Amino acid sequence: MAKKKSKDKAGSNTIAMNKQARHEYFIDDEIEAGIELQGWEVKSLRSGKVNIAESYVYVRDGEIFISGMTITPLQAASTHVVANPTRIRKLLMSRKEIDNLIGRVNREGMTLVATTMYWVRSWAKIKVGVAKGKKLHDKRTDSKEKDWNRDKARIMKSSLR
């Protein structure tokens, strides 16, 4: 029996990353969620015209939504559909996951942050991090640790010569 060829495409499956989230929050754990999109939005995602850096995730009426995410419409987008780049989009999760997130946000004072958007086969997925905000001194210690690790790597590299 012949083996099926795996379709390895060059490039990454990542559409967009929220690098600022790791700087602003302690991310406890991440949960994968689907996202409800319109046709023109999927085309824009394929061309990489999305920004999740200023987005925030919230709970309303037992459902989870993302707001502030900007998907820029393509020039060749449909003329009969009015494109709203910053509309509120619903995130798709199981009821058990939603209840778990609602409990953690209400009890533990955590917040929900969009960290990464990527493709799983032909579906756009978004990782939602359960996070706690950092104080200013936490950010300073993180930057000092990052600088020290960079200097340490430089010293090790020069000592091996």
Curated annotation (Swiss-Prot):
HAMAP family associated with the record: SmpB (MF_00023)
Q: Per its record, how is this protein called by name?
A: SsrA-binding protein
Where does the record place the region Disordered?
138-161
Organism superkingdom = Bacteria
Q: What is its main location?
A: cytoplasm
The answer, when asked if RNA-binding is one of the entry's keywords, is yes
Q: Record's GO cellular component, any one? A: cytosol
Q: What biological function has been recorded for the protein in this entry? A: Required for rescue of stalled ribosomes mediated by trans-translation. Binds to transfer-messenger RNA (tmRNA), required for stable association of tmRNA with ribosomes. tmRNA and SmpB together mimic tRNA shape, replacing the anticodon stem-loop with SmpB. tmRNA is encoded by the ssrA gene; the 2 termini fold to resemble tRNA(Ala) and it encodes a 'tag peptide', a short internal open reading frame. During trans-translation Ala-aminoacylated tmRNA acts like a tRNA, entering the A-site of stalled ribosomes, displacing the stalled mRNA.
Q: Which NCBIfam families does the record associate with it?
A: PRK05422.1, smpB
Q: Which UniProt keywords apply?
A: Cytoplasm, RNA-binding
User: Which GO molecular function annotation, any one, does this entry have?
Assistant: RNA binding
Which species is the source of this protein?
Answer: Aliivibrio fischeri (strain MJ11)
Q: Where is the composition biased (Basic and acidic residues)?
A: 139-154
Q: Does the keyword Amino-acid biosynthesis apply?
A: no
Which Pfam families does the entry mention? SmpB (PF01668)
Query: So what family is this one in?
Result: Belongs to the SmpB family.
Instruction: Name a single GO biological process.
Output: trans-translation
Annotated localization: Cytoplasm
